[in-house]
Amino acid sequence: MSTEPSSKPVFPITDEVRHALAVTKRGVDELLVEEEFAQKLARSAATGTPLRIKLGLDPTAPDIHIGHTVVLNKMRQLQDLGHTVIFLIGDFTSLIGDPSGRNATRPPLTREQIESNAKTYFEQAALVLDRDKTEIRYNSEWSMPLGADGMIKLASRYTVARILEREDFTKRFQGGVPISIHEFLYPLMQGYDSVALNADLELGGTDQKFNLLVGRELQKQYGQEQQCILTMPLLEGLDGVEKMSKSKGNYVGISEQPTDMFGKLMSISDTLMWRYFELLSFRPMDEIGGFKREIEGGRNPRDFKVLLAQEIVARFHSQADAERALEDFNHRAKGGVPDDIPSVTLAGAPLAIGQLLKQAGLVPSTSEALRNIEQGGVKIDGATVSDKGLKVEAGEFVVQVGKRRFARVTLTA
C-alpha cells in the first residue's frame, strides 16, 4: 500500500470560474499564484464555500481619497462574486507604523489618534463596500494577547536576512539610516493577521508585496493553506505623473462636494481617463473598449469623461448630485456663476487683493493668491485681475479663483 500523502482534489475550471478569474485580474498589478487562486475559485464554486478575502488598512489618517478606493473597488468586485470580505483595521500595527516605502522611521500613532481615525475609516470605505456583507475586524484582537512570549516565538519564525530583502530596509541599512527593531516586527504582525483570519487571498498596493508574501510564508509554517496575494497599482493623481496624494494636491477626496469632485475629474487628460476607467469604474471592460473605438471614429472624449465623472460622483453622493454637478460644470464652462456659491462678509476696505482672497477662503495663503493673479486665474465680477498690489474698495462682487472656486463677497470699511 502506498504511503505517499494523498494529493489535493482538483476542481474543474468552469466558465463561471473563468469569469470570476477575469473579474479578479482586471486592473491588477500581480496575482500570485494565479494557478492556485484559480483552484481556490473552482473549489469555492464546487462546494459553495466562499473564499476569505482580506484587506488590512492602518487608520493613519481620518479621510481617504479615490486613490485609496482602487483596492476597495477590487474588494467590492470579489464581494459581488459571493466571497467573504474582511475589512481589517490595523489598530495594533498602527502603533508600530508601516515602514513600507519609507526612508526613515515612521512616527507611531497614539491610541487616541488611531481610535479617532478608525471612527470614520469604515464609514467612508462603506461607500464602496457592501456594508452588510463585510466582516470588520481589528488586529488587536489577536495581537495584544500574544504578549512578550508570543511575540518572541513569532519573531523566531523569520530571519533578519529575509527581512533585509525588503528594498526600503536594504537602502536604509546600506545608507547608514537607522532602522528600529520594532520596524522589523511590522511585516511579521501583518503576516500573522493572515494566520489569525485564515485568509485565502490578501489584497494590497504594490508597495505591500513583501508584507503580503510574509503572510503567505507564515501560514505555511502554521500548517494552513497559503493565501494568494493580489497587488493593485497606485493610482496616478490628477496631474497624471505622481501617485495621488493629499500632500501633492493632486487628489480627489471622497467626501468632497459633488461639484468639486466632478470638476476635478473632468480636468484629467484624455489618456489618464482610460486608467481611471479601468481602476475606478465598474463598467465592463468590453464597454470601455467600445468607448475607445467610438473616439477613434471621431467621438469627443469629453462625452466619456462625463460618464466617468458622473459614475464616481454618484457612487459617493447620489445620481441626482451627479446630474446637478454636470449642469453646474456646463454652466461654468460657459462663463456662468454657479447658484450655490458661498457668501462672505469681510471688513477692512480698502483691502489688499491677496488678503481678500485668503479671508474669503478661496486660497490658503496670500502667496498662493499672488501666484493665481500672475497666472491670470483671478476675476472680480468677470474681469481678470492683473495687479498684485490691487486694493479692493467696499462693495458687493463675485470673486473667482481658477475654474471652480467662487465667493460672493460683501466688503465693508
From Swiss-Prot:
Gene3D superfamilies: HUPs, RNA-binding S4 domain, Tyrosyl-Transfer RNA Synthetase. A motif ('HIGH' region) lies at residues 59-68. Keywords: Aminoacyl-tRNA synthetase, ATP-binding, Cytoplasm, Ligase, Nucleotide-binding, Protein biosynthesis, RNA-binding. A motif ('KMSKS' region) lies at residues 243-247. Residues 351-411 form the S4 RNA-binding domain. ATP binds at residue 246. It catalyses: tRNA(Tyr) + L-tyrosine + ATP = L-tyrosyl-tRNA(Tyr) + AMP + diphosphate + H(+). Its main location: cytoplasm. GO terms for biological process: tyrosyl-tRNA aminoacylation. It is found in: Cytoplasm. Pfam families: S4, tRNA-synt_1b. One of its GO terms (cellular component) is cytosol. This is Tyrosine--tRNA ligase. The gene is tyrS.
